[in-house]
Amino acid sequence: MLDKNKIMILCKVVDNFGDIGVVYRLARALSDLRPNLELTLVVSNLESFHKMASQIDPTKRIQDFHYKNTTWKIVDWNLEVENGKLKTESEKLETENDTDKLSTFHFPLSIILECFQCGRPDWLEEQLFAPEFTRTVQIIQIDYLTAEEYADEFHLLKSGTRRANIKKIFFMPGFTEKTAGLIINQVENLGATASPSGVTPFAHAHCLHSVSATSGLHTLAQPAFKIFFFAYEDDCSAVVKGIADFQNKMRETDSDFSVVVYLAEGKSSAPFEEKWKILNSPFKIVKIPFLQQEEFDYFITTMDFLFVRGEDSLARAALTGLPYIWQAYKQDENYQLVKVNALIDRMKDYFEPKLFEPIQAFWQSYNDYENTTKSEPLTLMLLDSANHKNQKGFSDFAKKLHENGNLAEHLLNYIDGLSL
């Protein structure tokens, strides 16, 4: 019989922070909903996890992680196991009755969440498919976030394994009510649609206190149009020019208008700054350190405009109701444009057609890595954002995403309904 209170989450880190970011967020959301859950996170890159949650010790193969009033077990994917035993003495769990067997580690081989088609570590694969292992296990594959139609079709679709007692099913994040929706954490619940930016005064104040206290970012309170920039390594010329032209255009009617761009730590920071210097530093930039996940969530809600990349920050941006631009992960044959256009199709009905034209034009140009990005649509989109013309479209889209429900809650409801 399934022990539905014990959940193992598997994460093989491919994108430095994207994969573990979603997994950490999912674990937080599950614990927030049900603090009594026993979670075990199996992660292949503890260094990346440490950047996101400083409590993680990258040198420990097995460790406890304290989140609010709960304790998770964190396990290194790369454990070396022979015949069901850890190879080195230092990797044993320190328990009174430890006999070196993996089964004594209390690994919850009941509900297993495989995230992003990550597969399973060798030691877990051997245990699951050992001839003597007959207990029923439900594997739930949490797939990549996409707006493509196949997400609707694959959600809750059963899949086979090589053993009848090992069940598997697809669980699809997405942007429609036919999918599992998005992970909604506390910060999104604080302020969805409560103000033009979708952020309550409480959330805004909490962010200012939390981020400035831990990171020294005291410039947040300055009156300026605040842009957050987080991207993959790219040329950045069109982005810098588009922002500079936007500021110049706004100053035609307001000489005091200014832009501050907050540069996230990462590979995009240096090329952005290089192009910014070539244009004689036309606006202010502030380099921000790598933020803990909770700080990041609050921080972006204080912005006026967002550049985000990958999966996790896309979901955060979409839920805020703020104007944003998404950069998809580059794929062979420019396939990322398929994903970008799929999301564009989901969004466009929430906007007046004329207002959506520059949004669509820049999203497509920005994600077309085979052609030069055009700056003009970005300038127009920023002008519409500063004048609150496109705000309703982004807010209405965010409302719909909230109405679709919380992926973590849908997941727990699905697990509750299992009768294996």
Model-derived features: positions:
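Active-site donor-binding acidic/aromatic loop of nucleotide-activated sugar
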Residues: S281-L291
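Active-site donor-nucleotide binding/catalytic segment of nucleotide-sugar enzymes
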Residues: I9-K12, C115, M172-A192, L220-S258, ...
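Intrinsic disorder/low-complexity segments
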Residues: V81-L109, A192-Q222, T253, E274-P282
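Active-site and donor-binding regions of nucleotide-sugar-utilizing enzymes
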Residues: C11-L33, T40-G84, E94-K101, H106-N165
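Short internal beta-strands
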Residues: E38-L46, V260-G266
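A donor-sugar binding/catalytic signature common to diverse glycosyltransferases
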Residues: K12, S31, L291-K339
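A nucleotide-sugar donor-handling region in carbohydrate enzymes
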Residues: D143-V211, Q222-S237
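C-terminal amphipathic helix plus adjacent low-complexity
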Residues: T193, D349-L420
